[in-house]
Design a protein with these regions (language model features):
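Pyridoxal 5′-phosphate
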Residues: 2-476, 480-492
Length: 492
């Protein structure tokens, strides 16, 4: 048996088991419509499901809001207060010093582009950007475009260097990364969790390498800046931005219960103050600061909020954080959702550690069960403690896209393709993989149903659509319906 498919030992300790018994997943699932749709929702790395409360809030806000920073009416001022409070909540939840560290964007991709355009004029001929082969396209393509398409037009040659990862373990090759960073490395880009391999690079070690580069930044610092892609890390872990020590951290709320259209760039305030904004126009300029011969920027964070923002999306996104606290904290805690209660960082740590523990247990179960599927190759670390809550794999003789389609026919949500992680797939010599991914509303029964369906498809052929009951050794829950129809419309 290859290392890619060898069985693993469960990581559940007695303490973890007691914690899981206290985790009220059935109560949590009662907040979501998908549980009534007869589907196994295991494509959460792409997007999570929105709970009732956020959908209701969004509908309510649509009927009563006005624009922000653009009116003296009671409705406008009320909406402005809620909108600005959302920035405070986001900063508090992530351990950022203040709202001045927060840039609200559409998604993680836009966050990376915002960094790229903000720093673009600072690059000098002969500089380089160091990234890794673990990156999502959103943290590779902008830098490729900068180095190969944009800066050469201005006579500046900037190299893009990529650090390898170990193909067996999926771990980032820190020695190779260190060899690429030098005194001309302006920026180091690294994911906090791969959306394909699940790998969680040691950001503290990456930060130390960036800090030691001796690159002369325009603000007088001698180090490389560090951009961390947190799209797959922030939704399932306790985040302390100040402790992380990164200059930039990105993520999207659609992977964290909120509807689509809101992402966040958390950034070093000094860099936001000294860098140029990504977009220009209304509200990002100061009152009375626009003249024919000069323009003055607004104070942070509004310097990076040009034009009418996604007001409703931003308010709902911040409330998603509050709702996560209510769902993840133990019963009896005062509620955060729809309240003015100041977010307590201790509560954030307790809640997100519980989320991480539960996701880890589901991932360990999936890894262990996948080891028994004939011909299956699992990619990335075998230890659930060293990876995010997803599993990507291939099965000999089966096209991954056809596997995902067959899983869909069996009522299981999956994703196949390169997951926008083309570099990592090419490094392993494959074009695509099939992926299952979990969030804190999933259950051990969900894992069993997904992998039982996969095993049936592999054994019977890719057109199989019947999901057998989970074996008693892996689940004590009732078996699912024999056939779960493919999603046909709204889940509401």
């Amino acid at each position: 048996m290859s290392a890619a498919t060898r069985p693993v030992t469960s990581v559940t300790s007695g303490t973890q088991a007691r914690a899981h018994r206290a985790w009220s997943v059935d109560s949590i699932r009662g907040h979501f419509d998908f549980v009534h749709a007869g589907r196994t929702v295991t494509n959460n790395a792409a997007s999570t499901q929105p709970p009732h409360e956020l959908l209701t809030l969004q509908h309510t806000l649509v009927r009563q809001y006005e624009n922000v920073h653009r009116g003296q009416s009671s409705a406008s001022m009320h909406t402005t207060r809620r909108f600005e409070a959302a920035y405070d909540d986001i900063a508090r939840f992530l351990g950022a010093p203040s709202r001045s560290n927060i840039v609200v964007v559409r998604n993680t991709t836009e966050a990376h582009n915002a960094v790229m355009y903000s720093l673009m004029t600072e690059f000098r001929d002969g500089d380089n950007v160091v990234s890794t082969e673990l990156e999502h396209n959103s943290n590779f393509v902008p830098w490729f475009a900068l180095c190969h398409d944009i800066l050469p037009k201005f006579g500046r040659n900037v190299a893009l260097r990529l650090a390898r990862f170990d193909p067996e373990s999926g771990e980032l090759d820190l020695a190779h990364l260190a060899s690429l960073i030098d005194d001309r490395t302006k920026l180091v880009c690294c994911t906090a969790a791969s959306n394909f391999l699940g790998t969680k690079p040691p950001i503290a070690a990456v930060r130390a390498l960036a800090a030691a580069s001796a690159y002369a930044q325009p603000n007088g610092e001698c180090r490389s800046y560090l951009l961390v892609d947190g799209a797959q890390w922030v939704p399932g872990n306790f985040v302390d931005f100040e402790h992380l020590g990164a200059d930039y951290l990105s993520f999207s709320f659609h992977k964290m219960l909120a509807p689509f259209g809101v992402g966040v760039l958390v950034a070093n305030q000094r860099l936001l103050e000294s860098s140029l904004p990504f977009l220009y126009g209304g509200d990002m300029v100061g009152d009375g600061q626009v003249f024919a011969d000069r323009v003055g920027f607004n104070a942070l964070p509004w310097k990076y909020a040009a034009g009418t923002p996604n007001i409703i999306g931003t308010i709902v996104a911040a409330q998603a954080l509050r709702l996560i606290l209510d769902l993840a904290l133990r019963a009896g805690q005062p509620h955060y959702f729809a309240s003015d209660r100041v977010i307590d960082r201790g509560d954030v740590e307790a809640a997100m550690n519980r989320v991480a523990d539960w996701n880890r247990q589901l991932t360990a179960q999936a890894i262990e069960r996948l080891a028994a599927v004939p011909g299956l190759t699992l990619y990335g670390p075998r230890d659930a403690r060293r990876r995010s809550s997803l599993v990507a794999f291939n099965v000999a003789g089966h096209d991954p896209v056809q596997l995902a389609r067959a899983l869909n026919d069996a009522g299981v949500e999956a994703r196949a393709g390169c997951h926008c992680a083309a570099l990592a797939h090419r490094a392993l010599g494959i074009e695509a993989s099939c992926r299952l991914s979990f969030y804190f509303y999933n259950t051990p029964a969900d894992v069993d149903r997904a992998i039982d369906a996969l095993a049936t498809i592999v054994c019977r052929g890719s057109d199989a659509s019947v999901v057998p009951p989970a074996s008693a050794s892996h689940s004590k829950t009732s078996p699912p319906k024999p056939h779960q129809p493919a999603f046909q419309g709204s889940l509401s």
